[in-house]
From Swiss-Prot:
Record organism: Haemophilus parainfluenzae
Pfam families the UniProt entry points to: N6_N4_Mtase
EC number: 2.1.1.72
Keywords carried by this UniProt record: DNA-binding, Methyltransferase, Restriction system, S-adenosyl-L-methionine, Transferase
InterPro entries, sorted: DNA_methylase_N4/N6, DNA_methylase_N6_adenine_CS, RM_Methyltransferase, SAM-dependent_MTases_sf
Listed name of the protein: Type II methyltransferase M.HpaI
This protein's record includes keyword Zinc: no
PROSITE patterns (alphabetical): N6_MTASE (PS00092)
The UniProt record lists the keyword Transcription: no
Record field: catalytic activity: a 2'-deoxyadenosine in DNA + S-adenosyl-L-methionine = an N(6)-methyl-2'-deoxyadenosine in DNA + S-adenosyl-L-homocysteine + H(+)
Disulfide bonds: none
């Protein structure tokens, strides 16, 4: 399927799209927190940011088909205002407030460490919208005879880890999202051959996932470097989506890449044991069970040496 990448101001590019031409919109806009996206648009004053948000959301509403859906990632500071714009100003219909939970977040010493992001799901029609539940069912936690044997409906709390440094798909973008996150939304709210849009495409996750799910993708970003990054990503080898991050359970299930494994060992295992000494034996067993056979002789020697995990690769 066709994958379009447009280097442009989002609002300007949206105005060039036809009315009622998009089946699904998924986007992670600037949160106005001063992050460096290569532009100054993430540091607007309060009213300017709301004006900017209203303008691009209004254009999204215009291009969205009558049965279409929009998913928006948004930080807590502005999410209630985005909700108001969608529901009261544009007349869209609220469907779900999704919590994306992840195990590693930003460390804080004067407050609780953030461990989730929020995603708003709105539809253009209250009842007539695409939602393919059977494409996204998850295994039942407990078996009951009344259960749907195809699996359970995912809750509105989704557990996917961040795209960490140990992930091969990591790109130099400050807010790269996991492919599996987009995969679930695209499978649920679009069909093969549909057109999916991201007005703030960043590292190109949406187009990459659309390509391998047989959807046409349109990605817009004002940063030329990000557009080039997204183009290169489309041409990269596909080995499945990063549905389960290696660090989700603290001990990766697959560390076949020796470079990643070495970095993981140096940066993570020592930290874990320093802070979880009471779990030392259990953790060592997990390491051996899950990827001991994949280790080099040097790594095995370091692991076995009196179980002293003070790894030194110098």
């Amino acid at each position: 399927m066709d994958q379009r990448l447009i280097c442009s101001n989002a609002i300007k590019a949206l105005k060039n799209l036809e009315e009622n031409s998009i089946d699904l919109i998924i986007t992670d806009p600037p949160y106005n927190l001063g992050k460096d996206y290569g532009t100054t648009d993430d540091n607007l004053n309060f009213n300017k940011y709301l004006e900017f948000s209203h303008e691009w959301l209004e254009e999204c509403y215009r291009v969205l088909k009558p049965h279409g859906t929009i998913y928006i990632f948004m930080g807590m500071k502005y999410i209630s205002y985005i909700y108001k714009i969608l529901e009261q100003d544009l007349g869209m219909y609220f469907n779900s407030w999704i919590t994306w939970y992840y195990t590693q977040g930003i460390g804080k010493t004067r407050g609780y460490s953030p461990r989730h992001d929020d995603i708003l799901m709105f539809t253009k029609h209250p009842k007539k919208f695409t939602f393919n539940l059977d494409r996204i069912r998850v295994p039942q936690k407990y078996y009951r005879s009344v259960n749907n044997m195809r699996g359970a409906n995912p809750s509105n709390v989704w557990e996917f880890s961040h795209v960490h440094y140990c992930n091969k798909n990591r790109k130099p973008h400050p807010t790269q999202k996991p492919e599996a996150l987009y995969e679930r939304m695209i499978l649920a709210s679009s069909n093969e051959g549909d057109i999916v849009l991201d007005p703030f495409v960043g590292s190109g996750t949406l187009n990459f996932v659309c390509k391998h799910l047989n959807r046409s993708g349109i990605g817009i970003d004002i940063n030329k470097e990000y557009i080039e990054m997204a183009k290169e990503r489309l041409d990269s080898e596909f080995n499945g989506f990063d549905s389960i991050d290696e660090r989700m359970k603290r001990c990766p299930n697959d560390l076949s890449d020796p470079v990643i494994r070495k970095q993981y060992i140096i940066n993570h295992i020592n930290w874990f044991l320093k802070n979880h000494e009471n779990a030392r034996e259990e953790f060592l067993n997990e390491v051996k069970t899950k990827y001991y056979k994949k280790m080099t002789q040097e790594e095995k020697r370091l692991l076995d040496k009196e179980n002293n995990l003070s790894f030194d690769f110098s």
